[in-house]
Each structure stands twice: as C-alpha cells, then as structure tokens.
C-alpha cells in the first residue's frame, strides 16, 4: 500500500510544518492544496518537501476531493492543517502497508484540544473520522462544511489523530455561532421550515457550550 498524504490549507502557517512532517512519516508523498493563502503557508510546505498546488476554495468536501486528484497513489491520508498524527497511528499505518487490504477505508479516533485541554465530553471523543481511503472506491462527500468519507468497508482503528480544534474560549464561541448559522442554512435548503430550524440550532449551540463548560471544570 503506497499512500499519498493530502492537506488543504488557507493561512495555516502556524501548523502546516507539523502537519507535513507528520504525514511524511507514513506517506510516499505529501500534497498541499492551498486556497490563496496570504501568509507563508505555501513557502513552509514547499520547504518541508510537500508538492504545493493552488485552488480557490470550493468548500470542504470538494476541496479535499480535488486534492486527491493530484495524488500519485490510490490510497489517500487526508489531514487537516491543524492536525497531526499520534505515534500509535503512525505505527499502526506503517504496520498495515504490507498487507493485501480488502477494505476501502480506515477511521481513526481524534483527540480534540481547546488550547492545552483535551476535550472529551459532548461527543468530542473518541470522535472517529475516516481519513485513510482508497480514492478509486470512495471519496469525500460534497458538503461545504465538515465533509466526510463514507466507506462501505471501513476499519475503525483505536489509534489517534491530534486536533488543535480551538486556540481559546473566544475562538470556540465564534466558531460555534458560525456553525450554528451553517446548520440553519443547510436545514432550510433541505426544506425544514424556519420555525423548526430554531430549536435545532439551539440544540447544536447547547451541545458545543456543554463541552466548553466541561473543559472549564
């Protein structure tokens, strides 16, 4: 199994070096698809050995699928710029490379952090995400926010991706409000009446808030 690592970026200079170096430990190549960053993201990625391409942002799912098109290999490990691989995941992926795999994808546990705090409550752990997949069989769905890979034969491995989800409480609240608005818009597109949208959005916000309160305990 040869693997191409992919990362989509936009002004990710703070974390991109860590992400690229992390993927290099399991991948034969690293692809960075950048959305017109105005900082040093592309320069840092290229210096670290990544192949860098530019594509105006198409939305989360379409952008990640587009990144896979630049990959030389069928097997893709998709990593977000603010993520890195834990040692247990690196060891696991390197151990399965030499086996004939009949599955189309692998899902991994994700450790989400707010600052230095590991968020475990409100569904934030184990937070399985499918990131290693055979692009000839499956790929990212077309959602513009929080897209996912839906494999038909997925192995759920108990190893970890590290995710620096939020830098601070302020960033958490800002993103919570943004995603609540996205949820309402998507429900409206799907035909849900505004009167029915409000309780759902409140529920989404409450879930994020409860997890936030747990971090502060």
Locate the predicted segments by residue.
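Glycine-rich, basic loop-to-helix element that forms the pyrophosphate-binding segment
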Residues: 56-71
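Short aromatic/hydrophobic "clamp" motif used to bind/position activated sugar donors
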Residues: 76
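Acidic helix N-cap motif at the loop->helix transition within catalytic regions
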Residues: 17, 39-48, 88
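Catalytic donor/gating beta->alpha subdomain of glycosyltransferases that bind UDP-sugars
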Residues: 136-195
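N-proximal low-complexity "stem/linker" segments adjacent to membrane-targeting elements
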Residues: 1-21
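A conserved acidic beta->alpha catalytic loop
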Residues: 22, 34-42, 80
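Single conserved hydrophobic/aromatic residue that forms the stacking wall/gate
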Residues: 208-217
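Conserved donor NDP-sugar-binding/catalytic core segment of glycosyltransferases
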Residues: 88-120
């Amino acid at each position: 199994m040869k693997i191409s690592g992919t990362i989509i970026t936009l002004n990710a200079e703070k974390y991109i070096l860590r992400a690229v170096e992390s993927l290099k430990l399991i991948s034969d190549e690293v692809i960075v698809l950048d959305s017109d960053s105005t900082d040093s993201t592309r320069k840092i990625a290229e210096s670290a050995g990544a192949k860098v391409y530019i594509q105006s942002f198409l939305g989360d799912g379409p952008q990640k699928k587009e990144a896979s098109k630049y990959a030389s290999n069928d097997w893709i490990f998709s990593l977000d710029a603010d993520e890195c691989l834990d040692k247990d995941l690196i060891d696991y992926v390197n151990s399965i490379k030499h086996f004939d795999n009949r599955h189309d994808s692998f899902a991994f546990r994700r450790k989400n952090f707010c600052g230095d705090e590991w968020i475990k409550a409100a569904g934030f752990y184990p937070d399985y995400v499918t990131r290693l997949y055979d692009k000839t069989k499956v790929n990212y769905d077309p959602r513009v926010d929080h897209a996912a890979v839906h494999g038909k034969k997925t192995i759920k491995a108990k190893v970890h991706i590290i995710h620096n989800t939020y830098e601070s409480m302020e960033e958490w609240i800002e993103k919570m409000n943004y995603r609540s608005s996205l949820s309402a818009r998507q429900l409206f597109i799907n035909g849900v009446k505004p009167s029915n949208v409000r309780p759902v959005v409140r529920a989404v916000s409450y879930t994020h808030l409860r997890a936030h309160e747990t971090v502060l305990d």
